[in-house]
């Protein structure tokens, strides 16, 4: 395809932090730039001025700061409207779980502005939340480790009697710690509560080799594409830093 026939698109992407709990934005942008079918201009959307993806060569053509999800939908929409007035954004790709609800809520307003998104409904997002994962698995025939959602640290003792050790202590948005004792579980509870708030999810530990699969379906049960990946290097936040596709 010649350059003259390439479709020109301006795509805004979040998740530019590439630290020990990395966001997907940098990898998403690299994937977009590898596609030869489009003439792309990439707009980075960051929450902090020191996110590494802002300063990496060949990633974003221009970067704007946007408000944290806690600021609400109105603040986000106003900021995106300002960015759109300058950059004429065609597509926005949000990459964090914690920001998806706000982007879904403002989806119709973005569409009116001429900005496309490809997002689930609020109900679909809620159904695959960590808190609802076990019920989701039961409903759709997936084997999912048992879990308990707790709000009080005193509940760790009763849950440990049911699950046994080790257990996985998970934040409601991000991060997870494998606890081998009650003391380790309590420490993880306090740390995750301070960072992400309640509730905390306690999950049954499953031993074995972890394989992650990213899949694209047609919405009717047919898989269009699937890429399995095995993590080779894990950060202290439990995030994959290096891996191989299988």
Where are these regions (language model features)?
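ATP-dependent carboxylate/phosphate-activation module, predominantly the ATP-grasp catalytic core
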Residues: 183, 203-246
